[in-house]
C-alpha cells in the first residue's frame, strides 16, 4: 500500500506545471478527468490522467534526466520498467521537464544545454546592395564559374570579401541549375508562371 503524501508536492511535478498538489492522495495516484479533486480546467472528457510519482520514481527520472536530456526509446522503456510507470508517461515526463528547464533558462537568460546557441560561432549575414547585386548579375551572365582573379576583381568593385563573392556564385548557380545558359524549357515556364484563377 502506497504511503500517504503530506506537505510538499512530489519532485516529479515541475514548478511551472499548472497541476496543483493535493495533500492526502497516495504518492502514486492516477487522477482521472472526472475526479472532482482536479482543478476545474483539468476536468472534463478527453483529458489525460495525471500521474503523481513516488519520491524514488522521481529520483530515478531525475537521475536519468541529468545524464541525458534526450534518452532513446530503449533507455525510456528500461527506466519505465524499473520504476513501474508506463513508457509513454516517462516520455511525457521528459518532454515536460525539458520544457520547464528551457523556460527557466530563458528567464535566467542562460544558454540552454540541450541546444546549440545560434549566435555563437555563426558569421553575421552579409547585406548586398542593389548596385552590388547588379554588378554580380552582369558578371554571372558572362561567366557562371569565375576564377579567383575574376572574383578578386569583383571584390574590389563591390567592396565585398572575395569569399562572399564565391558563395554568391555558388548560391546563384544552385538556383539556376539545369538551365546552364539554355532557353528555359516549357516545364520551367509552366512552373514559374503565375497561378491562374
Curated annotation (Swiss-Prot):
Its main location: nucleus. Residues 46-105, 121-180 bind DNA. GO terms for molecular function: DNA-binding transcription factor activity, RNA polymerase II-specific; RNA polymerase II transcription regulatory region sequence-specific DNA binding. One of its GO terms (cellular component) is nucleus. Expressed in hepatoma Hep3B cells. GO terms for biological process: regulation of transcription by RNA polymerase II. Keywords: DNA-binding, Homeobox, Nucleus, Repeat. It comes from the Eukaryota. It holds the Pfam family Homeodomain. The keyword Electron transport does not apply. Coiled coil: none annotated. It is found in: Nucleus. The keyword DNA-binding applies. Transmembrane segments: none annotated. Residues 101-127 are annotated as: Disordered. Belongs to the paired homeobox family. DUX genes are present in 3.3-kilobase elements, a tandem repeat family scattered in the genome found on the short arms of all acrocentric chromosomes as well as on several other chromosomes. May be functional despite lack of introns and a poly(A) addition signal. This is Double homeobox protein 5. The lineage of its organism: Eukaryota, Metazoa, Chordata, Craniata, Vertebrata.
Amino acid at each position: 500500500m502506497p504511503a500517504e503524501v503530506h506537505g510538499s508536492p512530489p519532485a516529479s511535478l515541475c514548478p511551472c506545471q499548472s497541476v496543483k498538489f493535493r495533500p492526502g492522495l497516495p504518492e502514486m495516484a492516477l487522477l482521472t478527468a472526472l475526479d472532482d479533486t482536479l482543478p476545474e480546467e483539468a476536468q472534463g472528457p478527453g483529458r489525460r490522467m495525471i500521474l503523481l510519482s513516488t519520491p524514488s520514481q522521481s529520483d530515478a527520472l531525475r537521475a536519468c534526466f541529468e545524464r541525458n536530456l534526450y534518452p532513446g526509446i530503449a533507455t525510456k522503456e528500461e527506466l519505465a520498467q524499473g520504476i513501474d510507470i508506463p513508457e509513454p508517461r516517462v516520455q511525457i515526463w521528459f518532454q515536460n521537464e525539458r520544457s520547464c528547464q528551457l523556460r527557466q533558462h530563458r528567464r535566467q537568460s542562460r544558454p540552454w544545454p540541450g541546444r546549440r546557441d545560434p549566435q555563437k560561432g555563426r558569421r553575421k549575414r552579409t547585406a548586398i546592395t542593389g548596385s552590388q547585386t547588379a554588378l554580380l548579375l552582369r558578371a554571372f551572365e558572362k561567366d557562371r564559374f569565375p576564377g579567383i582573379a575574376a572574383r578578386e576583381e569583383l571584390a574590389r568593385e563591390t567592396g565585398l570579401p572575395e569569399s562572399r563573392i564565391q558563395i554568391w556564385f555558388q548560391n546563384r548557380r544552385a538556383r539556376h541549375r539545369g538551365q546552364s545558359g539554355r532557353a528555359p524549357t516549357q516545364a520551367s515556364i509552366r512552373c514559374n508562371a503565375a497561378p491562374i484563377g
